[in-house]
Amino acid sequence: MPRIEFEPKLDFKDVLLRPKRSTLRSRAEVDLMREYVFRNSKKTYVGVPVVASNMDTVGTFEMAEVLAKFSLFTTIHKHYQVDEWKAFVQRVDSNPQIMSQIGISSGISTSDFDKLRTVCDMIPELEYICLDVANGYSEVFVDFIRRVREQFPTHTIFAGNVVTGEMVEELILSGADVVKVGIGPGSVCTTRKKAGVGYPQLSAVLECADASHGLNGHVMSDGGCTNPGDVAKAFGGGADFVMIGGLLAGHDQCGGEVVEKDGKKYKLFYGMSSDTAMKKYQGSVAEYRASEGKTIYMPYRGDVSRTIHDLLGGLRSACTYIGATKLKELSKRATFVRVTQQTNDQYSAYEVPRID
């Protein structure tokens, strides 16, 4: 018979970080850099572990060039062709600052695998692979991870998405280094409404991080961050990386053209399982499928650098409030308190800084 779990599961909106005594005199003293050695690839990562999503409107080459200046990572979306990858590498002249902060995304079809192998063989500096499916619980996905690990034994593999500890363990033991955590929390994802499936993001991160770290693996919180405070909460919950999409949407570096409506500028932003994405890349929505994503006009925000400064400033502030001198200490210092109200929104909810 159906089973109900009565233990409360929490999202970012359900908690706040409790402030604690601190020896820090300034936010400038906070060190946001992390260094990880991955379980399966044995490679070392150094950077600020905030990751641009591999959505085609966010995970662009242009985004990667800017984010790399801040030591942030970009998972390049899977719809770039081999020639476009070649042109990008030539343009940046294999800049190690950029190449060390990007990964190639791939689906799990035969053609996806062939393109992945071609690009990785062509660009030896490319050391990160992101294997991305909506449902990371499928046996075919686990088999694909094993196949990619066998083909690329020294590449670092991100894989997901899942939301429970036992599946995190399965993916890590199958060859993944970093497991992406999150089903349905994204700002333009409608999976929870269409399928009724999901898991509150903070609880998913807490439980999956515990499972992963027990195997010397890593987790990436993917989705659900509506402001810099949510990013801090994800790190506080044990995430090693935090992937963001909506917070980076609408900028110059995003895919698509700027459009004008009623005198205001916008950029199109949509989920990768939306009607828009499926029609763009597959010609139509298959009869057996339903759209599981929204398409919205995102207010134009100008250059992404301004938003990155705001995001990193919020992270430093969170660390300062709870007495963490380094981002590494955030999860150790974090205590969450349950709340019924986050903020006083009498005038406006949080908005990412943008250029009107």
UniProtKB/Swiss-Prot annotation:
Its EC number is 1.7.1.7. PROSITE patterns: IMP_DH_GMP_RED. GO terms for biological process: purine nucleobase metabolic process; purine nucleotide metabolic process. It is an enzyme of class 1 (oxidoreductase). Belongs to the IMPDH/GMPR family. It catalyses: IMP + NH4(+) + NADP(+) = GMP + NADPH + 2 H(+). This is GMP reductase. K(+) binds at residues 184, 186, 189, 192. GMP binds at residues 222-224, 245-246, 271-273, 289-293. InterPro entries: Aldolase_TIM, GMP_reductase, GMPR, IMP_DH/GMP_Rdtase_CS, IMP_DH_GMPRt. Keywords: Metal-binding, NADP, Oxidoreductase, Potassium, Purine metabolism. One of its GO terms (molecular function) is GMP reductase activity. NADP(+) binds at residues 26-27, 78, 132-134, 183-184, 272, 288-289, 317-320. The active site is at 189 (thioimidate intermediate), 191 (proton donor/acceptor). SMART domains: IMPDH.
